């Protein structure tokens, strides 16, 4: 087994990172270029490290080409928001910016437990970053080869424990921020210094690929821990955080028709005391920094490093670097995932209202005024908001005397709708068209009508009060987490998807491809057949994903490196 990085020519991303002068590149010069609406050359990649992606409106490409115009280039910004916690005052600020300075006028909640602005034109970029800074926010390292936004269970019911794990999410996020002053210099007009910069943890060429961390509090796997490179499973005693089980090597991205790529669930390393959290996290990240493949970006994620060097080798390397020995994994189990909708009361007697936001898109339309509703709530709310990893939002910390007012506003603006089915609440999609340049098929715009058709099928089979974890993603990169769904659709081309079946309801089993390149009609026919059988043949409390495996409709994925593509 080769435990060293294979000798090969480094990918071009490695060159541009080293040549970027600690992520500066010539971004500042491109900002002054009024000839084009976008960035050029290496800067297209470098702005990702500052939390932005260069995109264009794909709906308008043909029209603008006919008009001999460049594409409608704009930027998507993803905010750094560890644990998804945002104050009402911050919300008021981002609402105002989205309304006045974005092409689409929306706030998009994401599976990384934060929000995104879509459709920001280049002249508005500096003002956007300055606004975030004035609100105590930033977008540092929410994209690029960095530690991304840190996820944390959105469970304010266990108030003390939740606050403790959220504090660790913030500590981890801060600890692994890049030390370069490039962000402040470029976007905040910070003073340029002549000092020699260093990146003691990330290194001058940063990480081989993006790196994702989650903290989860059992029994609710609301963050889909197996989608992340590094996971901390909270272990408590008498309601107090005492330590974490550590899992590494999860990840969902793959490439169509490339059998060397695959999704993977995370592997257990062991248990650590809570005081060792940062040391272990740093040891894991530096191990991946040094052992990750920098020649082939398709194999650069931690999951491939683990497969190449082996779990035990990786574990021992982490122990040596941290000076800490892992203990045996403490018992834990997951019983559900997703979000707990409606009102719940925490042990501190505060109330928390979880709102379903379909596909995370907060916008006013002809049917509902979700954005106005959130704005009105933010104007009076005295607690905070918690964005969830399932693209929903919690109105947290509501005193009993304010419950009625909050609920009235939520109902008035369509943020609460008693007609939303369990199936719709269990369905999720990535953004895809028109802004994502990687999308091969529709996802967010496709899902609502598709779910309606699935709801009708389930009602016909007497399953109207049941749910199936359903995910749609426009490409195989995994943003919609279809590779942890019971039914996963992955875009192949316009109007066609690969269909995956057999994930479980708690997010611990990867589904397997059932049919390739299907139309919506063909997918619905399969869902009709399999849910009909599920309704007739299921065992008590047996989920759809478990049923299709037990019934032999699909074989379970046991070791994705070996059998995912079989």
UniProtKB/Swiss-Prot annotation:
The entry describes its oligomerization and partners as: Alpha(8)-beta(8). The alpha component is a flavoprotein, the beta component is a hemoprotein.
Q: Name one Pfam family in it.
A: NIR_SIR_ferr
Q: Which GO cellular component terms are attached?
A: sulfite reductase complex (NADPH)
Provide the binding site for [4Fe-4S] cluster.
430, 436, 475, 479
State the organism named in the record.
Baumannia cicadellinicola subsp. Homalodisca coagulata
Q: What is this protein called?
A: Sulfite reductase [NADPH] hemoprotein beta-component
The free-text cofactor remark is: Binds 1 siroheme per subunit. Binds 1 [4Fe-4S] cluster per subunit.
Which gene is the coding source of this polypeptide chain?
A: cysI
Fetch the PANTHER family from UniProt: SULFITE REDUCTASE [NADPH] SUBUNIT BETA, SULFITE REDUCTASE [NADPH] SUBUNIT BETA-RELATED
Instruction: Give the catalysed reaction(s), semicolon-separated.
Output: hydrogen sulfide + 3 NADP(+) + 3 H2O = sulfite + 3 NADPH + 4 H(+)
């Amino acid at each position: 087994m080769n435990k060293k990085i294979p000798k090969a020519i480094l990918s071009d991303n490695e060159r541009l990172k080293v040549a970027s002068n600690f992520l500066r590149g010539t971004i500042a010069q491109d900002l002054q270029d009024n000839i084009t609406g976008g960035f050029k050359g290496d800067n297209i990649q470098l702005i990702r490290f500052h939390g932005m992606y260069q995109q264009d409106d794909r709906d308008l490409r043909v029209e603008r080409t006919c008009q001999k115009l460049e594409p409608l280039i704009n930027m998507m910004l993803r905010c750094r928001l560890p644990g998804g916690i945002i104050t009402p005052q911050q919300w008021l600020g981002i609402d105002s910016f989205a309304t006045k300075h974005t092409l689409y006028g929306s706030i998009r909640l994401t599976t990384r437990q934060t929000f995104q602005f879509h459709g920001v034109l280049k002249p508005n970029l500096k003002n956007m970053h300055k606004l975030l800074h004035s609100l105590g926010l930033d977008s540092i390292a929410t994209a690029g080869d960095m530690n991304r936004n840190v996820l944390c269970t959105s469970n304010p019911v266990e108030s003390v424990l939740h606050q403790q794990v959220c504090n660790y999410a913030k500590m981890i996020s801060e600890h692994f921020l890049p030390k370069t002053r490039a962000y402040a210099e470029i976007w905040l007009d910070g003073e340029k210094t002549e000092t020699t910069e260093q990146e003691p943890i990330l290194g001058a060429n940063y990480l081989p690929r993006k790196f994702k961390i989650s903290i989860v509090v059992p029994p609710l796997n609301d963050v889909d821990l197996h989608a992340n490179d590094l996971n901390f499973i909270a272990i408590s005693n008498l309601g107090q955080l005492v330590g974490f089980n550590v899992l590494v090597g999860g990840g969902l991205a793959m490439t169509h028709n490339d059998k060397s790529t695959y999704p993977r669930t995370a592997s257990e390393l062991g248990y650590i005391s809570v005081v060792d959290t940062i040391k272990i996290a740093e040891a894991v990240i530096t191990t991946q920094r040094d052992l990750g493949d920098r020649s082939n970006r398709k194999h650069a994620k931690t999951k491939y490093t683990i497969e190449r060097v082996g779990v035990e080798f990786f574990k021992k390397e982490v122990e040596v670097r941290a000076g800490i020995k892992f203990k045996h994994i403490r018992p834990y189990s997951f019983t559900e995932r997703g979000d707990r909708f409606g009102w719940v009361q925490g042990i501190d007697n505060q109330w928390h209202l979880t709102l379903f936001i379909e596909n995370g898109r907060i916008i006013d339309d002809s049917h509902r005024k979700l954005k106005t509703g959130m704005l009105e709530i933010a104007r009076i709310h005295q607690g905070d908001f918690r964005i969830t990893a399932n693209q929903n939002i919690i109105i947290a910390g509501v005193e009993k005397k304010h419950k009625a007012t909050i609920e009235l506003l939520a109902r008035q603006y369509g943020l609460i709708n008693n007609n939303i089915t369990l199936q719709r609440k269990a369905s999720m999609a990535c953004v895809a068209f028109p802004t994502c340049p990687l999308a091969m098929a529709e996802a967010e715009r496709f899902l609502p009508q598709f779910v309606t058709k699935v709801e009708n099928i389930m009602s016909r089979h007497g399953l109207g009060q049941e749910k199936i974890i359903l995910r749609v993603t426009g490409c195989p990169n995994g943003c919609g987490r279809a590779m942890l769904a019971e039914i996963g659709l992955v875009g192949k081309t316009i109007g066609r998807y690969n269909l995956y079946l057999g994930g479980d309801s708690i997010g611990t089993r990867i589904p397997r491809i059932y049919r390739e390149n299907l139309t919506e009609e063909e997918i619905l026919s399969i869902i009709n057949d399999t849910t009909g059988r599920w309704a007739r043949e299921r065992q008590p409390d047996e989920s759809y994903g478990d049923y299709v495996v037990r019934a032999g409709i699909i074989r379970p994925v046991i070791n994705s490196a070996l059998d995912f593509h079989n």
